[in-house]
Swiss-Prot record:
Segments of skewed composition (Polar residues): 315-324
Pathway named in the protein's UniProt entry: Protein modification; protein ubiquitination
Protein name, entry field: F-box only protein 10
Tissue-by-tissue expression: Particularly highly expressed in B-cells.
Residue ranges occupied by any F-box domain in the UniProt entry: 1-48
Gene Ontology CC entries for this record: cytoplasm
Designated gene of the protein: Fbxo10
Protein's GO biological process: apoptotic process; protein ubiquitination; regulation of apoptotic process; ubiquitin-dependent protein catabolic process
Cytoplasm listed as a keyword: yes
Quaternary context: Component of the SCF(FBXO10) complex consisting of CUL1, SKP1 and FBXO10. Interacts with BCL2. Interacts with PRDM1.
Record's keyword terms, sorted: Apoptosis, Cytoplasm, Phosphoprotein, Repeat, Ubl conjugation pathway
Compartments in which it is found: Cytoplasm
Amino acid sequence: METGGLPLELWRMILAYLHLPDLGRCSLVCRAWYELILSLDSTRWRQLCLGCTECRHPNWPNQPDVEPESWREAFKQHYLASKTWTKNALDLESSICFSLFRRKKERRTLSVGPGHEFDSLGSALAMASLYDRIVLFPGVYEEQGEIILKVPVEIVGQGKLGEVALLASIDQHCSTTRVCNLVFMPAWFSPIMYKTTSGHIQFDNCNFENGHIQVHGPGTCQVKFCTFKNTHVFLHNVPLCMLENCEFVGSENNCVTVEGHPSADKNWAYKYLLGLIKSSPIFLPAEDHDFLMSLDLESRDQAWSPRTCDIVIEGSQSPTSPVCSSPKPGSKEAEVGSDGERVAQTPDSSDGGLSPSGEDEDDEQLTYRLSYQVQGPRPVLGGSFLGPPLPGASIQLPSCLVLNSLHQELQKDKEAMALASSVQGCLIRKCLFRDGKGGVFVCSYGRAKMEGNVFRNLTYAVRCIHNSKIVMLRNDIYRCRASGIFLRLEGGGLIAGNNIYHNAEAGVDIRKKSNPLILCNQIHHGLRSGIVVLGNGKGVIRNNQIFSNKEAGIYILYHGNPIVSGNHIFKGRAAGIAVNENGKGLITENVIRENQWGGVDIRRGGVPILRSNLICFGYSDGVVVGDEGKGLIEGNTIYANKGCGVWMMSSSLPHVTSNHVSYNGLYGVAVFSQKDGEFPGGHGAQENFSEDGDAILWEAELEKEDDPLRRPITVALVESNSINHNGASGIFVQSSEALQVVANVIHANGDRGITIVQSSQLTRVANNSISCNRQSGVKVEFQCKVELRGNGIYDNRGHGIITKGDGTAVVENDIIGNRGSGLQLLPRSDTKVLKNRIHSFRAYGIAVRGRVKALVQENIIFQGKTNKTIFQQITNNRECIMQNNKFLVFKKKSDTWRLVNPPARPHLENSLRGSSAAHSGHKVTAMATRITARVEGGYHSNRSIFCTIL
């Protein structure tokens, strides 16, 4: 365009009057004209697109108010798609070479209607030739018999959509046909409006009402800008079919049924449809900014170092036994003076009380140094949460816990990327399914891909059964009266990037050996659970946001066995994850937070592997193991829940190992004997998992799979955990079953380290480090059977051990530096005290209160203050037998005692066995530090808060 010509605005005004062919010719003049034609996007191109009777708004029906990125591009895509049906025209010529010289046959236009050439569609078809155009003028046309299409034709309605109605049953026998701008209704003799078995059919801008459309492979179809009212589209063995920008309303059955494996025989249109799909804008999601980095849980080994414990006076040390005054790297020193820190709360009267702190005080300051390094859990998810939570502060997840975007996940997972990119069977894109029974039903090895659709107000959105596969990308599924997506009988595929919410049943229902990949979805505000896996269902549930559901975020039962990893499950009105009725599952590296009930609830035969999860800020308990619950609970961070960290019933058999349980409002780990049936309200309402109202006998479908990650246990086992800074006791036991508490670090809890109030069978407490708790290290109540062996009980603000148990054994423990007595035996207790090392600064090494049956033998008892006795006995008790004990008294201020041969307990490296040894490389240093502030929170009742589950 030459300089000095017309202004651009005037050129645009002139060009706005041109028709489509003229615009195309002008764009070929030169680059300046080409750019000028492109600049008409929001004016002339928009006008052409919206004025075309063969199409509608490019974003109809889901977003008709949102303009496309380019009106010209949208019009171009529709124009190219509208010509697909004629692509085989050259195939009909006998010779491509001769066709170049043969005179091209002109397409005829046949008019049908009152006052026109033909009165009916049937009569026009009888006279039609190849690729003729049949125009139906406004009116209602009813065919009394089935119409057989034998030659390729184009059937178009004249005028606005709705002005031409056709009541017919058409059977296509030709290679290709196009139908545009018609309202289809079934004839009186058949519900089938259109059927093809081998050819290609293209529908543009049509309405279908109250009938059926059938396409059988190797036939293909291409449907765009159509409305289906109570109409069923049946696709059987189709190799490829496209449904784009369509609306399905009020179906009494399924809107679309895709049945059978895609046919290996393909007609001529297959390659053109495939090319059209690949040339259209890629629908794979771009990178999101609300999902960031993935989890990095690489563990780091920590070398073992020996424990040391030195007791000195005034800091002076023996020249023959030097003690380093500075702590070793990676260790912590705790010093307690004779006046020391005040005990914030005096132990209750049943504990026997402490000696008055002001009585017989020495001016000399007595101190001890305690330096030790112990094994705890491996590095845990959410390590930045290990400090005290700030009251009222908003929860900010560290960057390592923010979810990946779908784009990042697909880049990482090549199999998922291949699924997302595949096109086979039926492609349903940008369609609206509403106000009916079913959306899409895929069965009998069928294949379907759904992108960018909206499913709303249906009974269900998608069903996938009988070895079928679906790919669902970026769909909205909401207000379904049952489950949103339903998979059974080995259904599978990829469900990624969808928004699934406000459904009456589960957002996704997986059962009967179905095995989908559920990736990067938002599943929220459901009236029941977010995802349900049952009846031997499997699946990989990864990197999803599951929140604000009325029941469990993920519910696993009846031998469901999914892999649940890297999800954020939060703000649910029940449990985060529930595993019931013999459910299984590998649950790993999830963030489970702010749920109303337990973060994870395991009961009634549930046996999951719960590993490396962050379970935090719950309004009840972190992990609940109810009646007959089992499973491996390993390497989790259970933090700042208002109830207990782990709540267990004595009838359960979990293996709780290598967890970090801290800053929970009540007990760190609590074991109760109360049955579920005694809870108010029982279990609550049970979810209806039957299909179509029929009872399902899942027990007949058991899968016997040996899982190498699980080791069978016959006694509930709590081992190798770090349990610290919880509001009440670190471990609370009220159990009627046997229990083992082994190799744990129990530190700085708001009450006692371990409280055992009921233990009718043996509770074994071995090789634990119990330190700096606000009251006593261990308390054993009346008639409890307890064995305390190999523990290190240090620097607790009450007594070291208090017992009135019946059959308590205190063997080979180090009870050092506690504010009260090292060991206090209360009336009616029956205790064996063997081979312990006991020391107390302010009180007695061993205090016997009242009539006690005890055997105190071969213990080493260190003197505290020089004017205190080592042993105190209130009454003359012949049943308390003292034999072969060694009492060490300070002779001079420079005396130093050191715990050697063996070194300071616990000796954790010797307590590891079984599966714990398999993970012995996963170690972390847990240091005993002085508690400086009381953790707020009341004391637990005899049951879990809201521990039952719907």
